[in-house]
Every structure is written in C-alpha cells, then in structure tokens.
C-alpha cells in the first residue's frame, strides 16, 4: 500500500523489533503469499499456481488457536456447497470497521460483504463476458459446474456449458477474470440458476461465494483480527504458514 500509508511509529517499531528475522522452510526463504480474506480456510499453493505443493502453504482453518476442529473436505462438491452457503466463525469473519480500515484501501471498504457474498449475472452479461474474455461463442449458457476445487472450496477448473459448445477454464485467476469486468472476489462459489425460458435456458445466474482473493498463505483480514485479539506476530505467521520457522539470520 506504499510508504506514505504504511510509515508510522507503530510500523517503524515493528520493523525494529523484527529486524533480521526471516520466515524459513528449512534452509529456504518462504514464499509468503497472502490474500485479503481466505473465507474461513486457506488455500493450497498448487490449486492456484504451479503443481508444486509447498509444505507451509496448506489448508488452515482460520479459527482460534488450540480450538479443536475438523477440516471439511471442500474438494468434495457437496461439502463445498454446504460450507459456502454457511457462515462459519473465523478470524476473517468480521465487519469491524476499525480493523477493516487498517487493512483495506478506501475503495475496498465500500462493502463488508466479502467473507460471504453474492454476485448476479444475466444471461446477456455472461455471454458478453465470455465473448470478451475468452474470445468464444458458447451460445446461450446453460450451466457452470466445478470440475475441481481446492482445499478452501475455490474452483480451480470450471466447466461452462453452452448450447453451442462446452469449455473448461482455470485456474482460479482465469475464472475470476472471466466472470467479471475486473475480478470476481474469489473462485470459491456455487451457482444458482433462475428464470428459465421455454428452452430451459436460465436468464439469471447467482453466484454465492466465499472469501476475497486466492486465499493462499496469510489472510490479511484474519491476521488483523488476530492482532486486535492480542496474538503476537510470530503466532500469527506460524498460524498461516504452518510448518515454517522464524529464524534470526542477522542483527
């Protein structure tokens, strides 16, 4: 967010206290990915980028440390739909304006509906987006189905079924770019179809979604809530980058 916004006595003190400390995976510096809101469970690296899993970028339930929990299998479509339509507790499940103002730019604060959200696309708009983004004519769109989901419920392969052609897109960034003029909040969504015509073609699609961004690594809003609740920076880092270590490499 730039030096102007981030430079403050608090930031300067945080830099001083953590000088020389590096987040490590064995002898290698961690690839410390982050996104705005994981949606309750962080995503694994390989579902968003190269098929090379990283041991410290795995699925993590974003809830209080030490609380017993199970990690739902969100690669399963039935489990993913149940999770996305539900509003489970999580660090990043917050509408606290003070915390959000510390994490988000002004224009990003226009909505607090990012942990769970809805996006409506008309048949006409969906066809237009597909033509613009994919340079394809699939005909009228009949359905969109998840072919593969990651551990956070984010779709990594999406099948778009048209009257003329069926096409599969992925990974998550291509899906988000295709279904929005800019970027869909995330690819963790389920699709409801409405207003079918006489040919059975839906005239309206409602995407019910979870989270904001790719969801891999540190969840910015979750981390801000953890900080507000008194968690130390090392506990926050090791919550999101499980299996990593913080090492002092220089003074």
Language-model features and meaning:
Residues 1-251:
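Conserved, single-site charged/polar hotspot
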């Amino acid at each position: 967010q730039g030096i102007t916004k981030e430079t403050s006595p608090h930031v300067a003190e945080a830099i001083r206290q953590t000088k020389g400390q590096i987040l490590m995976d064995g002898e290698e510096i961690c690839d410390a990915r982050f996104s705005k809101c994981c949606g309750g469970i962080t995503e694994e690296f390989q579902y968003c980028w190269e098929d090379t899993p990283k041991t410290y970028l795995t699925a993590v339930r974003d809830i209080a440390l030490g609380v017993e929990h199970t990690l739902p299998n969100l690669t399963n479509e039935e489990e993913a739909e149940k999770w996305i339509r539900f509003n489970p507790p999580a660090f990043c499940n917050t509408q606290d304006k003070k915390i959000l103002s510390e994490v988000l730019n002004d224009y990003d604060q226009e909505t607090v509906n990012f942990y769970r959200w809805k996006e409506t696309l008309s048949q006409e708009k969906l066809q237009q987006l597909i033509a613009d983004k994919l340079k394809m004519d699939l005909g009228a769109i009949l359905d969109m189905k998840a072919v593969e989901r990651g551990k956070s419920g984010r779709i990594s392969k999406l099948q778009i079924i048209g009257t003329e052609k069926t096409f599969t897109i992925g990974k998550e960034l291509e899906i988000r770019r295709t279904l929005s003029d800019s970027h869909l909040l995330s690819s963790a969504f389920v699709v409801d179809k409405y207003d079918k015509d006489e040919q059975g073609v839906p005239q309206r699609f409602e995407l019910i979604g979870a989270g904001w961004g790719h969801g891999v690594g540190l969840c910015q809003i979750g981390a801000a809530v953890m900080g507000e609740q008194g968690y130390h920076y090392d506990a926050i880092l090791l919550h999101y980058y499980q299996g990593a270590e913080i090492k002092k490499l220089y003074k």
